[in-house]
Structures are given as C-alpha cells and as structure tokens.
Curated annotation (Swiss-Prot):
Organism: Mus musculus (Mouse)
Encoding gene per record: Cep170
Subunit annotation: Interacts with CCDC68 and CCDC120; leading to recruitment to centrosomes. Interacts with PLK1. Interacts with NIN. Interacts with FHDC1. Interacts with CCDC61. Interacts with TBK1; efficient complex formation may be dependent on the presence of CCDC61.
Matches recorded under InterPro entries: Cent_Immune-Sig_Mod, CEP170_C, FHA_dom, SMAD_FHA_dom_sf
The protein's name: Centrosomal protein of 170 kDa
Source species taxonomy: Eukaryota, Metazoa, Chordata, Craniata, Vertebrata
Phosphoserine PTM positions: 141, 355, 358, 443, 463, 494, 568, 577, 628, 631, 662, 718, 829, 870, 872, 922, 925, 950, 1008, 1048, 1102, 1104, 1122-1123, 1135, 1150, 1155, 1188, 1195, 1200, 1229, 1231, 1241, 1260, 1270, 1362, 1521-1522
Length: 1588
C-alpha cells in the first residue's frame, strides 16, 4: 500500500517519514534522532495537523534553535512545514528538506507498525500516526515505530531508493570522540537505532510499559529485520525494521502481539525474529527514558540472534526488496548479532537518556563499545540507568568480564591493588551500593545526598579514580550493584582487573566493540590501556589507591583548595568521563590524571595515608560534603572529556614516568597544591623543598620504607623505584588499607568537602589541610618516620633554619600533607601531567640533573643533605641563616600576605600558573621536568639561599636584576617580578608568558634577562627564570644552547621556579640554569661527588665530552664562552671570543659542540650568573656584602675545593665570588655536595665562570659572538665599519674584551690572577666576569647591539660583573637591581672594594685548584690567548684598515703602545702561562694600539669618562660613542678599573704591570665597551645606562 506521506529528506539523502502524529526530534529518545550535540535531547517536535495534512515543527526551547529555511523559529511555536522547506535542528549537519511523496508501505510493515490495514490503507501514515498515538502506548511505541517507520520508512524508501544510503546516509555527527568508523556497519543500525532506538526511547517513554520494551525489542531486533522489510516498504533499515521483518510476518502477529510484545520479550516475532533480540526492556520509572534492555539474548549466541534476526527478516521481508535490503539489513543484523544490540539498545537507551557524555547516547549504546565508558557515555551513566534497570547487572557482567580481563592484565597490580582495594574497596564496598546509587545520582541527580555522594563519590571518584578502581574491584565483587554503578569506574578503573563481575555471556564481539569504543573514548584505558598503564602505575598506584583511600581524603582535602581540580576530578569521578577522559587525557593520567583529588589521594595517600589517617579524617571529613558535591559535579562533568589531550599526554607521561603516585599525588596535588601552594609557594617551597623531598620519599615511599634519599630517588627513577615502591607501597597499601578504610570514611566525609571548591571552603580546608597537613607531616614523620619523619623534621628543621620553616613549617605540615598528599607531581618530566596551576613546583619532582649527582630534592630531603646544606649554609650559616632567618621572616610575612593573596588568587586562578607551567612543562614535560626537577632541586637548594634572602630581597633582586638588565625586559621583568611577587601563582602564567615573551624579545632584552637571570636566581625566579630562560636561552649561548633544549625545561624551570618559591628560585636559577642543562640530560646517573667536582671544574661536558683536564678546562671555559657565544653561534657565527676560545672548543670537542654540553655549563654559567646576579642582588639586598665575601670565600672555597677549584679560585673566584655573592648563601651555605647538586651547574658555571671568566671573555667575544656576526659584518661591512666608528670601536672593544678575557683567563690559568687581576686582569677579570655574569645579559644586548652593543655590553658586563663580582655588597646590589649589567659607578667602586676579598678568596681558592686549574686552564687559556691574540691582531689590522684613512700615526701609536705596554712576561713555572701572558700582552698591546688608533688623542676616553652616563643614554650610536665612552670610562673604566684594580691588586699585587696593562686594556675596553654602547644601535647603550 502506498501512503502519501511527508518526509524529511536529510542532506545525506535519508528520508525520514513524518508520521501523522507528533514526533520528537532530538538527541535522546526521539523519533528523529540527531547526533549533533548542538541538538538538544528533546530539541523539537514535528506535529501533524490531520486537518491540514501538514506537519508543523515546534522548537522545544532548544539551546541552538530550530531553523526553517535557515531562519530560527520561535521557541514553542508551531511552524508549518511546507514542501522544500529546509529544516535544521541546532547545528546538526543534516539539513532536512520537507518532501511530500508516496511511500509504499508493505502491509507487513504497516501491520508491523501496528498499522491496521485500515490505518495502513485508509489512514495511511496519518492513521498510522493516529493509531500510533491512539494505540496503546505499547501500540504507541509501535505506532511511534510505525510513525517512525514512516519517516524511517521514508528513510527506508531512501534506503530502498538507495540501499547504499544507510551506509552512505549521514550518520549524524559522530559522537565526540567517536571514530568515524563507528557505525559503518553500525550506522545502519545506528540509523535503525536512531529510528528505532531513540524513537523507541520515546516509544518506551511514551509506552513506558512493555510496549516500549517490546518496541525496543522489536526496534532493536526489528531494526535490522524491519529495515530489510521496510526497505522493501521504503522503510529505512533505520526504522524498527528488524521488527518489521520479524514482524512483517510476526508484525501481523506483532500488530496484536506487538501490543503484547511490549511485554518483556513478547516472542511474537522478535523472539523468533531475532534470538538476540530476545531481551527484556525494562523501563526505569524513576528514570524516564531509561530503558533497561535485559538481554536475554546473552543466552543466545550472536549467531542465533543474527539468524533470528535474519530469519525473521528473511521470512518476513519481501524477497526482492529483502535481497536489496538484506545487505544493509544483514549489516545491521550482523552488527546487532555481533554486538548484542539488546545490550546495546538498553545500554543505548539508558545511556542515551542517562548519558551526559554522549550526544546520542542511544547511538553510543549502539556503538560497539558503548557499554563501556565511551567518550560520550560512560558506563557510569549506563550504570546509572542500569543501576536502576538491569544495567547494573549487565554492567556487573561487563565489569566481571572486563575486570576479569583487567584482572589478567592487572593481576600483579591487582594483588597489591586488591590488598588495598579489598581493604579500601571493601571499606568502600560498604559504600558500594550507595556508591552505585550515587553514581546514578551523580550522573542523574548531582544533588544526591552528600553522604551517599560522598561515599559514592569517594567511591565514584575512587572507582573512577585509581583507588576507587580497586574499590570498584572489591565493590563490584562485593556489590554487583555497586559494581554496576561503579562499573564505569570499574571499567574505567578496570585496570585493577580485580573485578570478578562478568557478563553472563560476555559477547566477545560486544566486548570488542566496547573496547573499540572505549579505545576511542579512552575508555579502553580501563580495559587495555588504562589497565596496563594503571597496572604499571597500579603497582605503585594500587598502593596509591590504598593510599588513595588516605589520599582520597587528602585529595579531597586538597581539591577543597582546588575547586577546579575538583571539577576535574569530578569529571574524572564521573566514571565514564574519568575513564575515557583518562585515556584521552592520558593513559598515565588514568589514575593520576582525572581525579586531581584522587591523584592527590593516590599520591597523597601514599604520603598522606599515614598522615591522612589522623589528619585527613579531620580535615577530610570537613571537606567531605564539598567533595561529595564536587563529585556529583564530577559525575556530571564526566559528560565531557575532562582531561585535555595535553593534560592527558602530560598525565600519560606522568603516569608513565611517575606511573604511580608521583603523578597521581603530584598532579592532583599539584593542581590543588598549586592553588594552595602557590600561596605557599615560597614558604611551601621551603616546606615543600623538604616536603617535596619528603613527599618524594613518601611518594617513593622510601621514607616509609627507607630513607628520603631513596624515596626521592624512587621518585626520580620512578619507574624502577616505583616498582620497588609498588612493593613497598604494597605493604604500605596494606598498612594504609586500614588507614585507607579510615580515610575512606574520612574521604567519604571529606570527599565532598574536598570537592566543594568554594573558596571559603578552600581557605577553610587549606587551614584544615594545613592543620591536618601539619598533623599529617607529623603523622608522616611517625608513619613514614623512617625517613619521612627524618626528612620532614630535617626539612622542618631546615625550614626552621631557614626561618621560612615557620611558615613552611605550617606549610611543611601543609606541604607535608600536601606534598604527602601530593607526592611529587611528575610534571613535565616524567608525567606529562598537565602541570596544574595548583601544583607547586615542589610537588613537581624537580630532579636535578644534579638530582642524579646529588638529588637536590633528595639532598634536601635527606636530613644529611639538609644538614649538609645546613652545614654548608652553616659555613655561611651564621650569616646566611641569620640573613635567611631575617629574610625568611620578611619572606614569611610577605608570603603570608602573599599566601592570603594567593589563596584568593589560587582559588581564583591558580590554574593559570599551572597552565602556564603546563605550557612550558606540559608539552615539554621531559625537558621541562628535567628543568623543573633541576629547578626544583635547585629551587630546593636555592630556596634556602633565597629564603635566606628575604623574599623581599629576592623580590628586590628580581626587580633590580630585571631592571638593570633590560629596560623593556626590565620593565616587563620587573613588572612580572612584581606581579609574581604579588601574585606568584597568578603570575606564574604571566611569568611564563613573560618569559616566553622575554625569550622572544629577550634577545634584545637578554642582557636584562641575564640580569633577570640573576633576578631569577633572586627572589624573582619566575621572571628571572623566564628571563634566564630567554636570556640564557637567547643571550647565553651556553645558556641558550644548554638551555635551549631546556627552554621548555627553562619554562618549566621558570614555572617551577615561579612556583618553586623564592628560596628555591635563588637556588633554582643557578641550578635551574645548570641543573636545567643537566635536566636536559636529566636521566643521568646521579653524579658522584667526583663527577660533580669534575663537572664543576671542567664543566658538565667533562663527564661526557671532556675526558682530559684540558678539555675540562676548556669545557668550563667553553661552557661559558659557548653559552655566551652560543646563542650568537646558534644565531650567528662564533663570536670573537668564541673564535679566540675556539681551540678550547676544539678541545672541548667543539666550542659550538660544547655549546650544547656547555649549554649546560654555559647555562650553568648563565645560571651561575643568574645565581650570582641573584646572589649579588640578593646578597647585596640581604647585606650580602659581609655575607658575600664570606659566602664568596666559603662558597668559592667550597666551590674551588669541590668543583670550581681551579677556575673558582683563579678568575673563578672573583666572578665566582661575585656569583657566589649572587649565590652567596646558596653557594657559601650549601656544602660541596649540595653545591654540586644545587650548584652543580652553578659550580660548573663558576668553574666555567673561571673558564667562564675566560669564557666570559669569550663571552665578551661570545657576546661578541653577535660581534662575530658583527665580525662577519665587519668583514662584510669592513668599509661600513671603517666609516663606522661604532664598528671600529666594537672591533676594538671586542678585541679589548678578547684581550681582557685572554688576560683574565691567562691570569686565572697563571694563577697570577691576583697580580694580573690587579693591574691588567682585574679589568680583564672584570671584563671576563662581567662578560660571564652581566656579560650574559651583555651578550643578549650585544647580540642585539651587535658589535656596538656587544663591546659595550661585554665591557659593561665585564665591568659590571667584575664590579658585581667584587661588589656584591648590598649597597652595590641595590644599585645593581637598577642596573645589574650597567652597575652604577657606585656599585663599581664597592665591588672594587669587595674584590679584594674576592680576589683574595679567589686566590685562596685558586691555590686549591691552582694546579688542576693551571694545567687545565693553561693549555686552554694558552690556546685561547693565542686565539685572542690572533683575533686582536686581525682586529688591530682591521682597525688599522678602518682608521687607515684617519690621520693618525699608526706606527708611532703602535710603537708607543708596544713600548709602553711591553710588560715583562711574568715569570711562571708554566711555559703556557708565559705564552699566554705574552699573547695577552700582545693582545693588550694591540688593544692599546687599537685604542690609540680609535682614540689617539684620548678624546673618546675623556668623553667616555666624562659623558659615559650620558653616553649610555644617548641613542645615537656615534654620539653615544663619545658620551658612552665618557660614561663608560668614568663609570666603568675609571671607577670600575680602579676599584677593580684596588680589589684585584690586594690579591694581585704581584703583577702590577701586567695588571696595569690589562687594566689599561680593560680601561680601553671600558671605553670600547662604552663606545660599543654608543655604537650600540639597538639602544643597548641605554640598557647599559640602566645597567650602569
């Protein structure tokens, strides 16, 4: 029979017959199902006006509206559909065209549709629609089916018309996360399901009675059969066509029977039709639209079902059409048979209505893996329905099946997990039923009672979470219902594999499909990915889960302070969301990723389990309510993938690297803690430094099991250690199981509050957490007391020592708790957990490269390390500690204020830093974490230093260091610093951005960045670090290159530093620089003291590249040179100094090659500079003058002794000393080991600082590296340069600096630094030092300013640095903050005074390292000096060429200069030294000649002396030339040189002549550098002014 019917023809060509009744259009249980998420579940209604025989569409107030002819129709208003009207629902890709046409409806189909023949023939579609509505609701569902059959018959017509349409048919927008392949075979079904599933849903809803159930049976079964039948009948297979087929014969029966069939399994036709279709559709009255399809077909084999389906279709279908229809129908039937469509259907329906995740949950149910947590729908959602319906049983079956699978996968893990899970899970199992209900409630009724939600959420979160997975395992075992509700979690958490819940007849195909879907949605994580990952993680994570019980409590507590995290965790808590999100987020995030709280719980559980037992119960219970609420939210949030791919990746990395609780606790902890801890960052960093160590120890569980060192090492080598940790944690799990049980209850109490992310609650909980954290830390001390208590107490004592301990002690408690709760977050490096904004850097396992050598965190963690550091600090401890205590008090006050501020900010936007950090850390987690680890390690160590410096000092340093270095960057840096100081957490992102920006612009700003590097080292490691990153990365070749790999690491460092807190910042900057470089090589065996010393002496390359001392010497030099020149090298050709130093490079392997390895060293140098700058600024700020000399002496002694012996003592001492002043407390205070671990890079830097001083000269050249580009320019633009005084002066300045570098290096090598430094080397050293430290900044500027800026920068840097090195006095520092590079004249004189000590110290240090340093340095210095001489000869020749047209008596000048400058070679035991001295003297002469050539009458010098300050300010390079020279000379040359001379003379009184010569060179260099500034077209001169 043919019916004239209205059709909606989708853009895909699918015809949907519009039944003559009202049909719903939407995503859920609608007659017309659209998959687009822009379509509401009930989006619109298409009604039929029988009188007018027209259809009207009414938008049901949908979010995205309904569009007729692209005009949005008013809501709740019927709009008549006319022919060819284009109908669009929401933004669904299907554009439906209203078509009226004949639809041939087979009698069977009409009968099947419950169309009586009269309806079929007389009423046709209208009657069918009427009967549909008129029919009993069973009939209604059938009629809906019929009505849909008509639209779908229309579709079927289309299908008939285009049997290919079903497959070709637009399947609707795939569900989010749905692969395009979904429904290829299923699409027909999906269509059928779309037609029959959703309409069924409606029908079911409408005929909530068995009719709908039957309809669903019929629909599900008939979907294929009916499709075939309908295809003949022009019905799309997407209609209830399997039933049609079945019912075409049975349909006739079904007409009558179908009304009966709506009973569970009216066998009329679908029983016969599709054995698999035999299922009971149970409507959950409590959940309208939720139909539980009990698959009786599970009893049927897929083949049986398939055969039944096909049999009924074959039997019923028209042979001709049936054959045509059979392909799609068979497709559908096959799919249905294979995929247990009944299960799919009920799953679909339940999930559809229930599924928050899926646009078209029904489709998801259809989807093969839809039963499992698809990205779109989670089993939890299904579980919600099934919990109400049979879904629970099915889920239990699936859970059993999946868990059996997972068990197999995770059994080893499960064993541990089950231990924890049985305890915790049984514990939670007690809550299992409520949890299942709660899961439903959470999914459906977020406002479910908090107690249940708490339990359920704890469970749900736990189930979803890692621990809950265990719980789920047990719960599922214990409670099938609970398992159903938690099945999603279990499926999600199936990783445990502990679930014995198995489907009666788990359909392997269905499982396969589910797995595919799960895989698509990341749910597969549950089964395969998550489980295996989790299994690895679970080894530790299971313990973590056991701990998670405790950790959940902690986590809940933490999420309290981290509302966002709660949401995340909530989303994670949502079983499906967590699950599939977890895979999407990352396999690693499986356990750690989604439930930040959970992660926190897990990690926290590890650490906190002990503490949480006592503490968590208190705080967590208070947080319990919020947690529950949050969990509900999470439940809902599960709808969407909670973890971004980045986070997933991060988490995945984290899970992989810190597969267990580090990432779990860390990430969750990190996010939470970051919010909390950012407030506490400095304090907490202090506390967290210890706590981090403790946390790591706890996380590594080594503290629990062994020592902090082990724990940290475990965290550091998380995979290997965590395995042991897993076992350790197994016992811990056992230990914590009781705690977990307690804590689980606590968690239940606490979970809700934790998830209740109100800021008040956060603050309140923070307090509670602090208290509980304190308790926890105490508990940790008690429980983990083996090492943890030692580490904690040591940490706490250390914190007390630091005075930061006071707040950090609270925060150490907090930090303990937090860090306990947050085992280190393997952000960036191991776990690519998205560095939560809440994650304080402490939480991030900042495994220094030196963590390998002396895991800073470990060092800090270990009481011995802490005490070593204290001892080393004690060396400077009396001063450092006093200063630190004072500073710490100031910092504490500041931090307290800031904590309050940050608590607000953290609550508000702690994510920003986290994400900024994520920006740096997440993507580059390995590098970043390496950086972060080094940073944190450095931070931890630096924290003490920085804590010693008051945060204010640090802040000042930050500001001051930034400001001198860059005007722009200075402003940006300073602003950033201030912002960071103000809102460290909030600004961490900005800092990272600023850092990135600085990196972008920092190359011009880099000098300031370099200073910022100092600043970074200082209190402003955020900005400083970003600056360091940019300046190190960009400015310091070594830094740049060393850091460039670490850029992310640097960013991470920055983030870490930013978050790491102030104290950590001081340390971290240097360590971050060096450590970052080492971080880059993070997975490095822990350096031995020997390695550290060797590296310190020879540079990091010594371990790998530098086998011989010469190489080592070269390495240290080159590292600095390389770092200095490297960025130019990277950007430009090797700078002059690099060229000069090239032999060394060659020795090193290649200076450029060295750059990378030196990048570490140079970065270390940069870091050292940073640290030095910081220490300079910080020490100065912190009356580091007294401290600095002592610190310098101590640190230099230590450094010299341990690491920078030769370099440090020689030229290294002054530069190192200044640097040490920068890191005075850090370096002086920390012991050699700490020095190695903390300042391993810094030491290297210091070493490199001496070689780096040489290299610094090289850096001058390195900064001259831009100069080398400039050199090329000079070569290229020789004429231009000839015309350009700037170029000449640059050349001259470069040469002078080369000479200075060579002289300084020679002096250093010769050990005559004292004498030479006094006269010649002092400027040289100054130049070298300046080049090394400020020079980094100068390098940046130089790069910018090319030769002009270069020389100026180099000279400025040299002078400033020498001044800085010498004048670390706070007074100088205060000025230095304004101009770190261009230290004011005042700052120079002061350093000049201090350099006496420095020089002396350097001399003493040198005596220790003299032999090695001599040997190593001499050859390299010799080569370097030769290169410098050659370079200067070339330069002199070039200058001659440049000035050949000037009327100058070059020969006279040269002769005069030679005669004057002929200083008798200092008699030394080393021919190399003599040669070096000769070379340097030649260079000196050449430089003097050049100086004479350039400024034969001394006009420039006079101008420089007179107008140098002004000269800096003038932007015209040439005008600058004169003024700059004036400025430079008086400022730098006169003021600087004499002080330096004075400073150096006491130490270097021996070689006054050489020193004089070098001083002259330095003076000329100063002039040149000033000229350089003048010539600096980039306005670096202004920077110089600022600096100066």
């Amino acid at each position: 029979m043919s019916l004239t019917s209205w059709f909606l023809v989708s853009s895909g060509g699918t015809r949907h017959r519009l039944p003559r009744e009202m049909i719903f259009v939407g995503r859920d249980d609608c007659e017309l199902m659209l998959q687009s998420r822009s379509v509401d579940k009930q989006h619109a209604v298409i009604n039929y006006d029988a009188s007018m025989d027209e259809h009207l569409v009414k938008d049901l107030g949908s979010l995205n509206g309904t569009f007729v002819n692209d005009v949005r129709i008013p809501e709740q208003t019927y709009i008549t559909l006319k022919l060819e009207d284009k109908l669009r629902f929401g933004y669904d890709t299907n554009l439906f065209t209203v078509v009226r046409g004949e639809m041939r409806v087979p009698e069977e189909a009409l009968k099947h549709e419950k169309f009586t023949i009269q309806l079929q023939l007389s009423q046709k579609s209208s009657e069918s629609e009427l009967p549909k509505s008129a029919s009993a609701k069973g009939t209604d569902s059938k009629v809906e089916a019929a009505a849909e059959v008509q639209p779908r018959a229309t579709e079927a017509l289309k299908s008939e018309e285009k049997p290919m349409d079903v497959s070709a048919m637009p399947r609707g927008t795939p569900l989010y996360g749905q692969p395009s392949w979904w429904g290829d075979a299923e699409e027909d079904e999906q269509r059928a399901f779309k037609a029959n599933g959703k309409p069924e849903g409606k029908s079911q809803e409408a005929g909530a009675s068995g009719c709908s159930t039957e309809a669903k049976h019929v629909e599900g079964q008939s979907a294929a059969a009916s499709e075939e039948a309908l295809f003949p009948f022009c019905r799309e297979p997407s209609y209830f066509e399997i039933p049609t087929k079945e019912f075409q014969q049975p349909s006739q029966i079904a007409e009558s029977t179908i009304h009966e069939i709506p009973t569970k399994d009216t066998p009329s036709s679908h029983t016969a039709g599709a054995g698999h279709a035999s299922f009971t559709i149970e409507f959950d009255d409590s959940t309208p639209g939720k139909v539980t399809i009990r698959d009786h077909v599970t009893k049927f084999t897929s083949d049986q079902r398939h055969k039944s389906k096909k049999a009924s279709p074959g039997t019923q279908d028209l042979p001709g059409i049936q054959t045509g229809m059979m392909a799609p129908e068979n497709k559908v039937a096959d799919w249905l048979a294979q995929n247990n469509p009944p299960q799919m259907v009920w799953e679909r329906t339940e999930e559809d209505s229930k599924s928050i995740k899926s646009d078209v949950p029904v489709y998801l149910k259809r989807l093969k893996g839809n039963k499992h947590d698809d990205g779109t729908q989670s089993d939890s959602e299904n579980a919600g329905a099934h919990r109400r319906c049979s879904k629970r049983a099915t889920l239990e079956e699936h859970l059993r099946r999946h868990h059996s699978e997972q068990k197999k996968k995770a059994q080893s893990t499960e064993k541990h997990q089950e231990q924890a899970a049985t305890s915790s899970t049984h514990h939670r199992g007690g809550h299992g039923v409520p949890h299942g209900k709660l899961l439903k409630q959470k999914s459906e009724e977020p406002s479910v009672s908090l107690p249940f939600l708490q339990t359920a959420l704890l469970r749900s979160s736990g189930s979803l979470g890692h621990r809950p997975s265990q719980e789920m395992d047990v719960m599922l075992k214990n409670q099938a219902t609970s398992a159903s509700s938690e099945k999603d979690n279990d499926d999600d958490q199936s990783d445990k594999g502990t679930y014995t819940i198995e489907l009666e007849n788990p359909n392997s195909e269905e499982v396969e499909a589910r797995k595919m879907i799960d895989k698509v949605f990341g749910v597969d994580d549950n089964q395969d990915y998550n489980r295996p990952i989790i299994n690895e993680k679970h080894k530790g994570l299971i313990k973590d889960w056991a701990l998670n019980s405790a950790a959940v409590v902690m986590e809940e507590r933490k999420p309290l302070s981290t509302p966002g995290f709660h949401n995340s965790e909530e989303a994670i808590s949502s079983s499906g969301s967590k699950r599939w999100v977890s895979q999407w987020a990352s396999l690693a995030a499986n356990h750690t990723r989604h439930d930040p709280e959970e992660r926190l719980m897990e990690l926290s559980a590890t650490v906190e389990n002990e503490t949480d037992t006592g503490d968590a119960g208190v705080s967590l219970r208070s947080t319990s309510c919020t947690t529950s609420l949050a969990s509900q939210g999470e439940r809902k949030r599960r709808t969407l993938p909670q973890l971004p791919n980045e986070e997933k990746l991060l988490e995945s990395s984290r899970a992989k690297v810190v597969p267990q609780r580090s990432e779990i606790g860390e990430k969750q902890d990190t996010e939470l803690q970051e919010k909390e801890a950012q407030v506490y960052q400095s304090e907490k960093h202090d506390a967290d430094r210890g706590l981090s160590k403790m946390s790591r120890a706890v996380n590594g569980e080594s503290p629990k099991t062994g020592g902090d060192g082990k724990a940290l090492l475990h965290s550091g080598s998380s995979s290997s250690k965590e395995k042991s940790e897993t076992e350790k944690e197994t016992s811990l799990v056992k230990q914590t199981l009781a705690k977990m049980q307690q804590q689980e209850q606590k968690e239940q109490a606490q979970w809700t509050p934790t998830k209740f992310p109100s800021k008040n609650a956060l603050g309140h909980i923070d307090k509670c957490r602090e208290e509980s954290s304190k308790q926890e830390s105490q508990l940790l001390e008690k429980v983990s007391g083996h090492s943890t208590s030692k580490g904690d107490r040591v940490i706490q004592n250390e914190s007390k020592r630091r005075k930061a301990e006071e707040i950090p002690k609270c925060q150490a408690s907090k930090g303990d708790k937090k860090e306990s709760s947050k085992s280190l977050v393997r952000q960036g490096s191991f776990t690519i957990d998205k560095p939560s904004s809440n994650i304080p850097i402490e939480l991030i396992p900042h495994i220094n490269k030196q963590n390998s050598s002396v895991p800073t965190a470990l060092a800090l963690t270990s009481a011995s390390r802490l005490r070593e550091r204290s001892d080393s600090l004690d060396t400077d401890s009396s001063m450092d500690t006093t200063l630190i205590l004072k500073d710490t008090e100031a910092v504490m006050a500041f931090l307290e204020a800031k904590l309050r501020e940050d608590n607000n900010k953290t609550d508000e936007g702690p994510d920003t830093p986290s994400y900024n950090r994520d920006n740096s850390i997440s993507p580059e987690s390995d590098v970043d974490t390496a950086s972060t680890i080094s940073l944190v390690t450095g931070e931890t160590e630096r924290k003490s230093t920085q804590k010693r410096k008051s945060f204010t000092s640090l802040y000042k340093d930050r500001c001051s260091t930034s400001s001198p270095s860059k005007d722009v960057t200075k402003s940006g840096s300073r602003e950033k610093i201030e912002k960071k100081a103000k809102s460290r957490s909030a600004d961490i992102g900005a800092r990272a951005d600023g850092r990135k920006f600085v990196q972008s612009s920092g190359r011009i700003r880099q000098p300031s960045i370099d200073l910022t590097d100092d600043d970074q080292t200082s209190s402003v490691p955020h900005s400083a670090i970003s600056d360091i990153m940019s300046s190190d990365q960009e400015t310091y070749s070594c830094k740049s290159h060393g850091r460039t790999p670490l850029t992310s690491a640097d960013e991470h460092n920055i983030h870490s530093k930013l978050e790491g807190g102030k104290a950590t910042k001081s340390k971290t900057s240097p360590v971050a620089s060096g450590s970052t470089s080492k971080s880059t090589t993070l997975p490095r065996p822990r350096p031995t003291r020997t390695s550290l010393l060797r590296r310190a002496r020879l540079g990091e390359a010594s371990d790998s590249e530098l086998a011989d001392a010469d190489k080592a010497s070269v390495a240290s030099e080159v590292s600095t040179t390389s770092s200095t020149s490297k960025p130019p090298t990277g950007r430009r050709t090797i700078s002059r100094i690099d060229l000069l130093a090239q032999p060394r490079r060659t020795r090193l392997g290649s200076l450029s090659a060295r750059s990378d390895s030196e990048a570490t060293i140079s970065r270390s140098s940069a870091s050292a500079r940073t640290a030095e700058a910081v220490i300079r600024s910080g020490a100065r700020l912190v009356p580091s003058d007294k401290l600095s000399p002592r610190t310098r002496a101590n640190s230099i002694s230590r450094l010299s002794d341990s690491k920078v012996k030769s370099m440090s003592s020689t030229h290294g001492s002054p530069s190192v000393n200044s640097r040490w002043r920068r890191f005075p407390t850090d370096y002086a205070s920390t012991s050699e080991d700490e020095f190695g671990s903390n300042r391993n890079s810094p030491k290297h830097t210091r070493l490199r600082t001496s070689p780096a001083l040489k290299t610094t000269r090289m850096q001058s050249t390195g900064s001259a590296m831009p100069a080398s580009s400039s050199f090329k320019h000079r070569i290229k633009e020789q004429e231009d340069y000839i015309r350009d005084w700037t170029a000449h002066r640059e050349e001259i300045a470069r040469i002078s600096q080369d000479l200075a570098l060579i002289a300084r290096e020679i002096n250093d090598v010769a050990g005559e630094i004292d004498s030479v430094t006094s006269s010649g080397t002092a400027p040289s050293t100054t130049v070298s030092t300046a080049a090394t430290t400020p020079g980094s900044a100068i390098d940046t500027r130089e790069e910018v300013g090319d030769l002009h800026g270069e020389m100026h920068k180099l000279v400025d840097r040299v002078f400033d640095e020498s001044l800085n090195f010498r004048k670390i006095p706070p007074l100088v520092h205060s000025k230095t903050p304004e101009g770190n590079n261009g230290r004011s004249v005042d700052s120079r004189p002061q350093p000049a005074e201090h350099p006496d000590h420095l020089t002396i110290t350097r001399r003493r240090t040198w005596s220790r390292d003299e032999v090695m340093g001599d040997n190593l340095l001499l050859s390299s210095v010799f080569q370097f000096s030769r290169k410098i001489r050659q370079s200067i000869d070339k330069t002199a020749g070039k200058i001659r060429i440049l000035f050949k047209d000037k009327d100058r008596n070059w020969d006279d000048i040269e002769n005069k200069l030679r005669a004057e400058s002929e200083v008798p070679i200092v008699k030394t035991s080393s021919m190399e030294i003599s040669s070096i001295l000769q070379e340097l003297k030649r260079v000196e002469k050449q430089l003097q000649v050049i100086n004479a050539m350039i400024d034969p009458d001394g006009t420039l010098e006079a101008l420089n002396n007179m107008g140098f300050p002004n000269a800096i300010l003038p932007s015209p390079p040439k005008q600058k030339s004169s003024p700059v020279n004036n400025h430079s000379s008086p400022s730098q040359t006169p003021a600087l040189c004499p002080p330096e001379t004075r400073a150096l003379h006491p130490a270097a009184a021996g070689v006054a002549a050489a020193a004089s010569t070098e001083f002259e060179n330095a003076e000329s260099e100063a002039d040149f550098s000033i000229h350089f500034n003048r010539f600096n077209p980039d306005g670096e001169e202004e920077d110089v002014t600022v600096h100066e």
